[in-house]
Regions:
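Short loop/turn motifs that connect adjacent beta-strands in outer-membrane beta-barrel proteins
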Residues: 1, 96-97, 112, 143, ...
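Membrane-proximal, glycine/serine-rich, low-complexity loop/turn segments characteristic
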Residues: 1-220, 226-232
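Transmembrane beta-strands of outer-membrane beta-barrel proteins
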Residues: 3-5, 100-102, 146-148, 238-244, ...
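One-face residue pattern on beta-strands with alternating periodicity enriched for small/polar residues
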Residues: 6-10, 131-133, 222-224, 243, ...
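Transmembrane beta-strands of outer-membrane beta-barrel pores
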Residues: 9-13, 95, 106-110, 152-156, ...
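Outer-membrane beta-barrel proteins
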Residues: 14-18, 111-115, 145, 157-161, ...
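Flexible, surface-exposed loop regions and adjacent strand-edge segments
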Residues: 20-26, 118-123, 163-177, 256-267, ...
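Outer-membrane beta-barrel transmembrane domain signature of Gram-negative proteins
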Residues: 69-92, 174-195, 267-401
């Protein structure tokens, strides 16, 4: 047999990272815009700007700073590089009576986000795929050839289980990357509790790492049997081809939701984690005896003031997502022969298709199978390749017009 093996390694990285202005510049430009519109009451107090200027001057700021948080969400959550790898093994060989080809493949597309594996789930973005193909051709006799073909793939897509009960969760997730405030709260406060905005659900690090995980499993299978038979023993130039194809596809979703109550939608995973937001009174700094400066603050706690703490994983379940199968069979009778200056050919084809799938509105319900049937015929004639004639006919239908 002939054996070949290939391995490919690649890396990916963002072509460009967004750049942000510092908070002091943003506040000053904001005040200028408000002044132009005469919205004096909406302007940021000078005491706040001064406090932040001092924080920048002394380096007293950062993504985990309680009083002066500054988070570059892109820098904190996006890696410089992500990796992918692919392997493929091919084997071919055979004899005069039989030939074969077998191929096995594996692909792994790694994560470009900085996620942290949790005790009960892995929130990373990743994709794994296994694919296979095998072709077997048998020369049963000098006039009979039989082929078996099998192919398929199995894919596993993993991602955080964010925004479970909203439309377009992926779109909303990536939008949060650019809309999450940079200076309203730290990733985590010094007491270890996640930070969050005044409007809640704005800490994308908490959302991505603590919101659970979703694993989508997808399978596709393709199966073919083809028979080619020469019928010269009946009349020269006559042949028959019969084929049968069967295709299946299915997908499941395994979802882990911390605090999720099965059968209800009243708890979104990320909301089961304790988060706080602090608003500091920069206008009234407190000068301590040791030379440090502190500020009083008001604190808001999520999901509510009496929340006891993070809830354990409350929902782990396999959800049937979609299923489909297709059956196709065909019988073709072909005749081609030359009588001196006369060429005659004829073709008759019969095929039937069946398609069955789950209802898109309710994945637990199967649609009625759809059927299509075709009867096709063609006859051609030419004399010295100068005078040509062709006759075609077809009769088609489906269960919709029975």
């Amino acid at each position: 047999p002939e054996i070949s093996f290939t391995a490919n390694f690649g890396f990916k990285q963002p072509s460009a990272a967004p750049e942000w202005s510092d908070y002091v510049t943003s506040m000053k430009q904001y005040n200028r815009a408000q002044a132009n519109d005469g919205n004096w009451g909406a302007m940021v107090p000078e005491s706040t700007i001064t406090a932040w200027e001092n924080a920048y001057a002394t380096g007293n700021y950062g993504p985990y700073n309680d009083v002066f948080p500054e988070v570059d969400w892109w820098k904190e959550l996006v890696k410089n590089v992500g990796y992918e790898q692919a392997y493929n093994l091919n084997v071919r060989g055979g004899t005069k009576k039989m030939s074969y080809f077998v191929s096995l493949g594996y692909l792994h597309d790694g994560d470009i986000f900085n996620t942290t594996k949790q005790e009960d789930f892995d929130p990373s973005f990743s994709y794994r795929r296994y694919n296979w193909r095998s072709n077997f051709d048998f020369n049963i006799t000098s006039t009979t050839k039989l082929s078996f073909n099998v192919a398929g793939k199995m894919g596993y897509q993993n991602q955080p289980s964010y925004y479970e009960n909203v439309d377009s969760p992926d779109e909303r997730f990536f939008k949060t990357f650019f809309t999450a405030p940079s200076n309203e709260f730290p990733i985590k406060y010094s007491n270890g509790i996640w930070g969050d905005g005044l409007s809640s659900d704005q800490n994308i690090a908490c959302l991505m790492n603590e919101g659970g995980s979703r694993n989508i499993k997808q399978h596709q299978g393709f199966y073919d049997v083809i028979l080619n038979q020469k019928l010269d023993f009946i009349t020269k130039g006559l042949s028959l081809k019969a084929s049968l194809s069967y295709t299946t596809s299915s997908s499941w979703t395994t979802q882990i939701m911390p605090g999720k109550i099965l059968g209800k939608d009243d708890l979104v995973a990320q909301r089961t984690h304790i988060r706080i937001n602090r608003v500091y009174d920069y206008a009234n700094p407190i000068y301590n005896a040791d030379g440090t400066i502190t500020y009083n603050y008001t604190e808001k706690r999520y999901p509510d003031e009496n929340a006891p703490g993070d809830l354990p994983v409350g929902g782990v379940y396999d959800g049937f997502k979609a299923y489909g199968r297709k059956l196709y069979y065909e019988l073709a009778l072909n005749y081609s022969r030359q009588f001196g200056d006369h060429d005659v050919s004829a073709l008759f084809v019969f095929n039937r298709k069946m398609n069955e799938s789950t209802n898109t509105a309710n994945s637990g319900v199967m649609n009625f199978p759809a059927y299509e049937e075709d009867w096709v015929g063609r006859v051609t004639y030419n004399f010295k390749e100068r005078y040509l004639a062709e006759f075609n006919g077809a009769y088609t239908g489906s269960e919709k017009f029975a």
